[in-house]
Amino acid sequence: MTPSYWNTDYVHAISNDGGRSMMGSRQENWFYNQLSASAKRGATWRIVGSQTVFSRLNESVAYGNVNPLDYDAWDGYQSNRNRTLSHLYDNGISNNVFISGDSHASWVSDVAWLDNKAYNPATGDGSIGVEFAGSAVSSPCPYGANITMALAHNATQWLVAANSELQWNDLYYRGYYELHISAEQVEARYFGFPTIVFRNTYEISLANFTIKSGANKLTRPVGGGVVESGTLKSGKTVQTNLTVDTANGTYFISHYDLEVL
């Protein structure tokens, strides 16, 4: 059962029920076996695709204190997430990269078993991997279809402060990210569209993140210490509006953030 707006209280009440499984028992056990098999055969990385955000996210700034989590994501299947984390930690399975979406926002986190394993958000020590969650290409921001950059930034400040493992969040830009994978590292490059009001080929580089092989955490300083938009834990946001027209490679300064998107 998943939230359908009218039943969120009930789904919240059963969100930590041991019988709930995001994948179902058969696929869940297959998943754990594949994680172990990948590590045993010496694969460098475990790239785990998830439709919804894996990390725990306190979003009471939007949802309120009664039901503060997104119970349509892994926060609605907490025992299943705990079993996944237990399998990774207990078996020493490292180099885990979760890639996810569905939330219409960008989130970058260390993957940590909060309340069970010690985790230091400043250094990333205690993490067992990272998560890169992407925004929507055109669907609206969950915090308001016509949200301004200022309001989006205020919300991201709250979210990053309230969630220890969350290292960066952007709510304003529609966009995508790329993964660049080598044996030594995985780099995630986030891009945003300055406007979706009309068809165009414009994009802005929002942030870049790296995980080194064997580190199991985002490389510090996270994002190189500076991002274009959103909030970066222990970093700063510098808005340049430097935009590239991907059709011809030319750069210009856009100001579409002043428009209602």
Feature roles, as predicted:
Residues M1-L261:
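Metal-dependent phosphoester/phosphodiester hydrolase catalytic core
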